[in-house]
UniProtKB/Swiss-Prot annotation:
<comment type="function">
    <text>Encapsidates the negative strand viral RNA, protecting it from nucleases. The encapsidated genomic RNA is termed the ribonucleoprotein (RNP) and serves as template for transcription and replication. The RNP needs to be localized in the host nucleus to start an infectious cycle, but is too large to diffuse through the nuclear pore complex. NP comprises at least 2 nuclear localization signals that are responsible for the active RNP import into the nucleus through cellular importin alpha/beta pathway.</text>
</comment>
<dbReference type="GO" id="GO:1990904">
    <property type="term" value="C:ribonucleoprotein complex"/>
</dbReference>
<dbReference type="GO" id="GO:0046718">
    <property type="term" value="P:symbiont entry into host cell"/>
</dbReference>
<dbReference type="InterPro" id="IPR002141">
    <property type="entry name" value="Flu_NP"/>
</dbReference>
<feature type="short sequence motif" description="Bipartite nuclear localization signal">
    <location>
        <begin position="198"/>
        <end position="216"/>
    </location>
</feature>
<keyword id="KW-1048">Host nucleus</keyword>
<keyword id="KW-1163">Viral penetration into host nucleus</keyword>
<keyword id="KW-1160">Virus entry into host cell</keyword>
<protein>
    <recommendedName>
        <fullName>Nucleoprotein</fullName>
    </recommendedName>
</protein>
<comment type="subunit">
    <text>Homomultimerizes to form the nucleocapsid. May bind host exportin-1/XPO1. Binds to viral genomic RNA. Protein-RNA contacts are mediated by a combination of electrostatic interactions between positively charged residues and the phosphate backbone and planar interactions between aromatic side chains and bases.</text>
</comment>
<comment type="similarity">
    <text>Belongs to the influenza viruses nucleoprotein family.</text>
</comment>
<dbReference type="GO" id="GO:0003723">
    <property type="term" value="F:RNA binding"/>
</dbReference>
<keyword id="KW-0543">Viral nucleoprotein</keyword>
<keyword id="KW-1139">Helical capsid protein</keyword>
<keyword id="KW-0946">Virion</keyword>
<dbReference type="GO" id="GO:0043657">
    <property type="term" value="C:host cell"/>
</dbReference>
<dbReference type="GO" id="GO:0019029">
    <property type="term" value="C:helical viral capsid"/>
</dbReference>
Length: 498
């Protein structure tokens, strides 16, 4: 992290802006989501979607994916150079669901990418509005985080499924920029780096020549992003070692896995933003709301307020529970896949249950699924309270070298105790402290051993009533001290990763 003077808030990253004051940030974030809303309305008009169809989250996702695909320059270039059977590189599309004779029918649509780009630019005052595109990517990433536990991906890179709370943003595309980097978890960054190092081990030319130089720059940049997420000097020093390695190999992979494990207790700082589906912004714009004039923030009350009065529908398969589908989407909207379920339940005002107890599959419907039995229901996305999103990781004391929550990466800045089984985690650290990073490893292990489970994170921070938009009256919840609520581990979570 550079000095404080060059630190940008997430909203600045999100909107690509340089340093701005709070009002300017609110206005530029407002401009961004307003553009998404205008684009969505225009697409609904083009596709002749009824009001009900336009509020269907599956239609929203198809439209979002079309615009992301239309602006994916790298892939577009690749498709043009490697023409594959049955793929027109100039077109994009997907399933649109319409209501016909009391049934939902799927219609596959195709559009020229050029046309989609034109509509998007027109909705965004003629600009490319990459910030808005990144915003949609983060919404899709948050939805994936809530839907799938990345067990297989973790095991493939030699990490442990228990580290899944470090995997936020693991499905974000490479092109998601600074705003994307801000929301990536420690595990996601470690995994990207390990994949890169493995390629280097298997392919002698990976680090060589002109391409190799670019690869090296990318490697060092990723190392710096990861370093900036760590909050203790020893973890950062270890990242310097990994970055400066002449020829990254197994030693670096070992170091990275060690660091990822250490992040279960010495949490990294990972940003959280409430990114909503395009149809929600569309509904607000259609009702005459002027986002740019009113201003908008992704980390305050605004997304809660927007969801309080938006009616969004979802298709529901025959044996799915609509309340569970709602929970999945609510978690995605608030980037709360790795939040403590006790905190989420308190804010939402209804019990949030672990993944393995949800009777629902993902939101999207595969093209081979039979539509006959598919119904739709209203998603319940409202909340009882609102809370400020955090990026701190929830370490307790000022030296920042204290306990975060195991298997939880906090989303909301709300006081909670940190119940955790230190023994389980520390067992992973037996043995190997030799090699060039030995002193740092020893220091990191010492800090972890000194972490006290009885500490409280976010001391004095609370939730707020939805009428309290200036956040003047924090309500500090008290939680049952004994059990920490992890979404993926409150049960025997099934493997949903297909």
């Amino acid at each position: 992290m550079a000095s404080q003077g060059t630190k940008r808030s997430y909203e600045q990253m999100e909107t690509g802006g340089e340093r701005q004051n709070a009002t300017e940030i609110r206005a530029s974030v407002g401009r961004m989501v307003g553009g998404i809303g205008r684009f969505y309305i225009q697409m609904c008009t083009e596709l002749k979607l009824s009001d009900h169809e336009g509020r269907l989250i599956q239609n929203s996702i198809t439209i979002e994916r079309m615009v992301l695909s239309a602006f994916d320059e790298r892939r577009n270039r690749y498709l043009e150079e490697h023409p594959s059977a049955g793929k027109d590189p100039k077109k994009t599309g997907g399933p649109i669901y319409r209501r016909r004779d009391g049934k939902w029918v799927r219609e596959l649509i195709l559009y020229d990418k050029e046309e989609i780009r034109r509509i998007w630019r027109q909705a965004n005052n003629g600009e490319d509005a990459t910030a808005g595109l990144t915003h949609l990517m983060i919404w899709h990433s948050n939805l994936n985080d809530a839907t799938y536990q990345r067990t297989r991906a973790l095991v493939r890179t030699g990490m442990d499924p228990r580290m899944c709370s470090l995997m936020q943003g693991s499905t974000l595309p490479r092109r998601s920029g600074a705003a994307g980097a801000a929301v990536k978890g420690i595990g996601t960054m470690v995994m990207e780096l390990i994949r890169m190092i493995k390629r280097g081990i298997n392919d002698r030319n990976f680090w060589r020549g002109e391409n190799g130089r670019r690869t090296r720059i990318a490697y060092e940049r990723m190392c710096n992003i990861l370093k900036g997420k760590f909050q203790t000097a020893s973890q950062r020093a270890m990242m310097d070692q990994v970055r400066e390695s002449r020829n990254p190999g197994n030693a670096e992979i070992e170091d990275l896995i060690f660091l990822a494990r250490s992040a279960l207790i010495l949490r990294g700082s990972v940003a959280h933003k409430s990114c909503l589906p395009a149809c929600v912004y569309g509904l607000a714009v259609a009702s005459g709301y002027d986002f740019e004039r009113e201003g908008y923030s992704l980390v305050g009350i605004d997304p809660f307020r927007l969801l309080q009065n938006s009616q969004v529908f979802s298709l529901i398969r025959p044996n799915e529970n609509p309340a569970h589908k709602s929970q999945l989407v609510w978690m995605a909207c608030h980037s709360a896949a790795f939040e403590d379920l006790r905190v989420s339940s308190f804010i939402r005002g209804t019990r949030v249950v672990p993944r393995g107890q949800l009777s629902t599959r993902g939101v999207q419907i595969a093209s081979n699924e039979n539509m006959d039995a598919i119904d739709s229901s209203t998603l319940e996305l409202r909340s009882r309270y609102w809370a400020i999103r955090t990026r701190s990781g929830g370490n307790t004391n000022q030296q920042r070298a204290s306990a975060g929550q195991i298997s939880v990466q906090p989303t909301f800045s709300v006081q909670r105790n940190l119940p955790f089984e230190r023994a389980t985690i520390m067992a992973a650290f037996t043995g190997n402290t030799e090699g060039r990073t030995s002193d740092m490893r020893t220091e990191i292990i010492r800090m972890m051993e000194n972490a006290r489970p009885e500490d409280v994170s976010f001391q004095g921070r609370g939730v707020f009533e939805l009428s309290d938009e200036k956040a003047t009256n924090p309500i500090v919840p008290s939680f049952d001290m004994s059990n920490e609520g992890s979404y993926f581990f409150g049960d025997n979570a099934e493997e949903y990763d297909n």
